[in-house]
Structures are given as C-alpha cells and as structure tokens.
Amino acid sequence: MNVEEIKDKVFDIIVSKMGVNKDQIKTESKFADDLGADSLDTVELIMELENEFDVQIPDEDAEKISNVQQAIDYIVNAKK
C-alpha cells in the first residue's frame, strides 16, 4: 500500500466516522479545530485506523496525532 492509497483510506475513514464531506478534509486539517471532533470521535477514529491498517497506536502516540497528516505519517511509518 503506497502513501496515496493510505491517504485515500484515511480520508474515507474520517468521512465515515466523523460525518464530514471528503472535500472538507485537507492533510493539515486538525480533527478538533477544523473537523469538529470531540475526544470520543478522536478515540474512535484512532481505533478504526488501527483496525483498518492492522497497526497498534499506543495512547501516548495517539495523543500526538491531532491532524490528518500526522495520522497518515504514523501509518506510513508503522507499515514500513
């Protein structure tokens, strides 16, 4: 899976979990500030990313993932 495929899948997960339109999402979008996520939304999003990409994201790392690009980068690095 290449970076573009990971990005597309992350965008799809955000759309399904957070109820936003795909065209509202940018890589620099912050989950809370730009996409309206609360803490529960963010936890559910991290869990879905773990399931979809078969990666484990420890809580201390999850706390550092606050925007879309950080999520993509984390998954890309975890899949290396």
From Swiss-Prot:
One Pfam family hit: PP-binding
Highest rank taxon of the organism: Bacteria
GO cellular component: cytosol; membrane
Keywords, comma-separated and alphabetical: Cytoplasm, Fatty acid biosynthesis, Fatty acid metabolism, Lipid biosynthesis, Lipid metabolism, Phosphopantetheine, Phosphoprotein
Modification type O-(pantetheine 4'-phosphoryl)serine: residues: 39
Primary site of residence: cytoplasm
Family of the protein in this entry: Belongs to the acyl carrier protein (ACP) family.
Biological function: Carrier of the growing fatty acid chain in fatty acid biosynthesis.
Protein name, per record: Acyl carrier protein
Organism in which the protein naturally occurs: Prosthecochloris aestuarii (strain DSM 271 / SK 413)
